[in-house]
Amino acid sequence: IIYHSAQRSDIVTTFLSLCVLNACNADGIVKTIKCTLREHDLKLDNIVGIGTDNASVMVGVNHGVYKQLKADVPHLILIRCVCHSLQLATSAAVAEGLPRSLDYLVGDTYKSFARSFSRQQAYKELFGILNDGEEEPLKIVQACSTRWLSIATAVERVLHQWTELKAHFQVARLAEKCYSAEVLYSMYCDEINKAYLLFLRPVLTEVQRVNKSFEAHNADQTKLLDDLVHLLSSLIKKVVIPTASVDVYTTKVEDYLDPKPYLGYSFEKHVDDMKKTGLAADEEENLRKRCTKFILVLIEQIRQRLPDNIEILRKVSQLAVEKVLYVLKPSLVPLLEAMGIPTPSTRIDAIESQWRSITTVAWKDTSTTQKFWCEVYNYRDSYGENPFGELADFAISMLVLPYSNAEVERSFSQMNLLKTKLRNRLSPNTVNAIMVIRAGLKRNKKGCFDYELPEKTIRLIGTRDVYKVGVSKPSSSTGAPHQPEGLLGQVGDSSPDCDDDDLFTL
């Protein structure tokens, strides 16, 4: 859940609850969401947005979770997780645009070292000899779909150690009589494979940069979608003729293709070197076509996964602190009308008036957009009222939108660390209680080593009351674990400090 905490004067992203579904479909998910909100005294009407992946059960146009929730909350905003979208788009572009041998090259290079300590040691010794012992070899990582854009790091590591890996597999094919090493050595000898990776590296770096900004804890939410559109624009400019004027969302890029696009310094330099050693013209043409196709597929895949209302959401960048404090700035009315949040004309007039006069106050904390709007929210005049109250409420509602599902993935990782193969009998109640405690400690900026237990909790230790819980099993109606009322329920300020009237997102 993401909400504005007046107590902490901050935008808080935290774990709410672990729920057990009775039905693994859209109806079951919606029912569980509604019941969980009721259990935490949160109003369904206060949901501003919902962040999901691209699964049909979540975003299906006919009977998806979003469609059902929007029927109850007409102003609900859907934001598909950009991190998931970029991963899927990149995977599709690699599969359709590039030779399958590249996937084998990167994947089997990892596999050859993954479970063999002797190979790792042999490679480490060879690497030290070739580099005079000045540096250690970087670990070869696995490119897999479960880690967002892990292929970017995998490609970078392989390229950085190309010569050393080539020498290693040359030795391994003779010493071990290994067919896999023989195949990999022949692939490392093919300079066209290296050219593909040199082309991929800067493109994946750009995509990874945007992905990291969406994953970050302290990113400015008002600028994230601008970064995504700039990525799309940058990819288009790589393959179209310089004089072309294209719309990043709708233009058919194939109609404006550059016959010989510039595909990066390292790639072009390597191609020039290959020409000197006999690269045929048809081979170069095929190489460039495959690289161009990769970019075209990537552009199309990103377009398909862009939020339907991206142009509206991009207008949220008007709320960035540096733009707010401009004396001359565009009206906020188009954004107010586009968001679809119930706003009577009188309220729009009030917000627009406050938007124009906000520069009349000397604001102290303008380091980040979040801190600035929290200061505006808490501002009081001589009469004890906030003259910018409506504007601050609207800005806060935009800042709590779920632009990324990175925190959800982190919660999954925590749960996997808790409920392992050795601890596979942990009940949902216990796992939920531990995760709630961790989230509460994090919200309070405490740790297990410096948190002071309440006196009431200390008195319970060693008594039977410490084991008392409100409900020992999940609710039959929702499957959502109830918060324990014993010792676990009193540690870590387990309930989010989200007031009844606060807007929030899931």
State each model region's role:
Residues 1-506:
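Alpha-helical structural modules in large enzymes and assemblies
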